[in-house]
Amino acid sequence: LRTNLFKLCLALCLTVGVHTALFAQTRPDFTGVWQLASPPMTSAQGYPELDLTPAGQRKVDAYRSLVDPVGDSPTLWCVTHGMPEIMMGGGGYPLEVIHKPDQVTLINEWQSETRRVFLGDRIESSESIFPSRQGYSTGHWEGEVLVVETRHLQEMVDSRFPHSADTVITERFSLTHDADGTPRLVADTVMHDPLWHEAPLSYRLEWTPSPLGWMQPYECMEERWLERLDELATQ
């Protein structure tokens, strides 16, 4: 009897394991170097419209009063874009995606700004997470769609999309193909900030494979250091 029960349990485990493996194989692999299918978003082409609440507008106005008179910006100080702007292809820089079973890593060529999407057991407890410009991203699968939720974002007034620390960004990543077979990475995104935004911000981003197929190194601080050396040499 014990032998028969053992065989039955083994058969069930193997069946579940094979089913899990086959299901995992149906999930798309987003690995690759991608570029936006349309030109990078600019103010001329039209960013998604964002309506600020009075509280959000006061925060942004206070920030603008500091930087506008001197023409300063975080870019001049090599500050990374953060979410959600990192995904919008500013400057036309490509995006590299490294897809593993427990983590999806997204690297923007500009400043090598990096996001990590943790899956399954990789997810940390809230107590161990510090707010940041990129936030903390976790993901789960809904069929062939990877649903990514980003929380723990720090308050940002210096972004094209200013937001409070209560912001939650949800992205739904999927893989489609054009008529000629060209793969297309799609991210349907919703940004929700109950404190600073009058309504959720929704938009779609699409990428196709980068013709170059790899990314150039980018070191913002080194360039500023070389400029500083030139200044010292002329003094």
Can you annotate each of these PLM segments?
Residues 7-21:
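Bacterial N-terminal signal peptides
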Residues 24-235:
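Hydrophobic small-molecule pocket/channel-lining residues, especially in calycin-type beta-barrels
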Residues 1-7:
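N-terminal secretory signal peptides that target proteins for export/translocation
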